Swiss-Prot record:
It comes from Saccharomyces cerevisiae (strain ATCC 204508 / S288c). Its main location: cytoplasm. Pfam families: Glutaredoxin. SUPFAM superfamilies: Thioredoxin-like. It is found in: Cytoplasm. Glutathione-dependent oxidoreductase with lower activity compared to the other members of the glutaredoxin family. The disulfide bond functions as an electron carrier in the glutathione-dependent synthesis of deoxyribonucleotides by the enzyme ribonucleotide reductase. This is Glutaredoxin-8. Induction: Strongly induced by the exposure to arsenic which causes glutathione depletion. The gene is GRX8.
Length: 109
């Protein structure tokens, strides 16, 4: 097991709400805007790989693929399990159920 996989597992285990992200990724910017809009940005640990060298970004993405089954940016993990990407947030927002869904996972009271 690579050090990247071990560290990915540790980060996910340490943070009930986790997001693999990159500063250059428009979908990640959207997800972060949701956390800010709902004032839960302090609850979601965002691991931003955007400033790392390309080869290191790829190693992290491979590690998260192995750990949670997704290498997408953003990858949102709740209580150690893959929850979704920005697509999930868009779907819930379009249906008008975003806050309800985030309440179900304990992110909103």
């Amino acid at each position: 097991m690579s050090a990247f996989v071990t560290k990915a597992e540790e980060m996910i285990k340490s943070h009930p709400y986790f997001q693999l992200s990159a500063s250059w990724c428009p979908d990640c910017v959207y997800a972060n805007s949701i956390w800010n809009k709902l004032n839960v940005q302090d609850k979601v640990f965002v691991f931003d790989i955007g400033s790392l060298p390309r080869n290191e970004q790829e190693k992290w993405r491979i590690a998260f693929q192995k750990v949670v089954g997704s290498r997408n940016l953003p990858t949102i993990v709740v209580n150690g399990k893959f929850w979704g990407t920005e697509s999930q947030l868009h779907r819930f927002e379009a249906k008008g159920t975003l806050e309800e869904e985030l309440t179900k996972i304990g992110l909103l009271p």
